[in-house]
Amino acid sequence: MDALEEESFALSFSSASDAEFDAVVGYLEDIIMDDEFQLLQRNFMDKYYQEFEDTEENKLTYTPIFNEYISLVEKYIEEQLLERIPGFNMAAFTTTLQHHKDEVAGDIFDMLLTFTDFLAFKEMFLDYRAEKEGRGLDLSSGLVVTSLCKSSSVPASQNNLRP
C-alpha cells in the first residue's frame, strides 16, 4: 500500500467510525428527550432529592443512591441503544466519547457524565432540589424594562402630556 492508499484507508475508517459515533449520539438525544426516559429520571430524583444537601461533605447515603442511579439509567439507555444498534457496546462507546467530548452537545455530555462523575450526579440532584423547593434561578432582579419610543426620553411638559 502506498502513502496515498494508506491515507485514503485511514480517512474512510475514520469517517465510518465518526458516522457511527454521530449515529449513537443522535439515538442518545432521542432516548433522553423521550417521555419514558424523562419520567424514569424524574421518578428517581423525586424519590431521593431530599437526601442531598449543598455542603462540601458527601454523606455515606449518597453512594448507594449513585449506584442505583447508574444501574437504572445506564441499563435503560443501553437497552434502548441495543434495540436501535444490535451489538452496541456501552464500554466501547464511553471510551470513544472521551475522544469526542468536545463534539457532543452539552446536555447529553452532562447527562452521561452523571454516570461516571459523582460530583456531576450530586450537582444534578442539588439543582433538582432547588427547583422543587422554588429556589431555581431567578432572573427577575436582572431584568430592566426600557421603552423603545423616543418620546419617553422627552419630559412630559415638552410632549404635551399632562402629568
From Swiss-Prot:
Together with ARL2, plays a role in the nuclear translocation, retention and transcriptional activity of STAT3. May play a role as an effector of ARL2. It is found in: Cytoplasm; Mitochondrion intermembrane space; Cytoplasm, Cytoskeleton, Microtubule organizing center, Centrosome; Nucleus. Belongs to the ARL2BP family. It comes from Bos taurus. This is ADP-ribosylation factor-like protein 2-binding protein. PANTHER family: ADP-RIBOSYLATION FACTOR-LIKE PROTEIN 2-BINDING PROTEIN. Interacts with GTP bound ARL2 and ARL3; the complex ARL2-ARL2BP as well as ARL2BP alone, binds to SLC25A4/ANT1. Interaction with ARL2 may be required for targeting to cilia basal body. Interacts with STAT3; interaction is enhanced with ARL2. Found in a complex with ARL2, ARL2BP and SLC25A4. Interacts with STAT2, STAT3 and STAT4. Found in a complex with ARL2BP, ARL2 and SLC25A6. The lineage of its organism: Eukaryota, Metazoa, Chordata, Craniata, Vertebrata. Its main location: cytoplasm. InterPro entries: ARL2BP, BART_dom, BART_sf. GO terms for molecular function: transcription coactivator activity. It holds the Pfam family ARL2_Bind_BART. GO terms for biological process: maintenance of protein location in nucleus; positive regulation of tyrosine phosphorylation of STAT protein. One of its GO terms (cellular component) is ciliary basal body. Expressed in brain. Keywords: Cell projection, Cilium, Cytoplasm, Cytoskeleton, Mitochondrion, Nucleus. It comes from the Eukaryota. Signal peptide: none annotated.
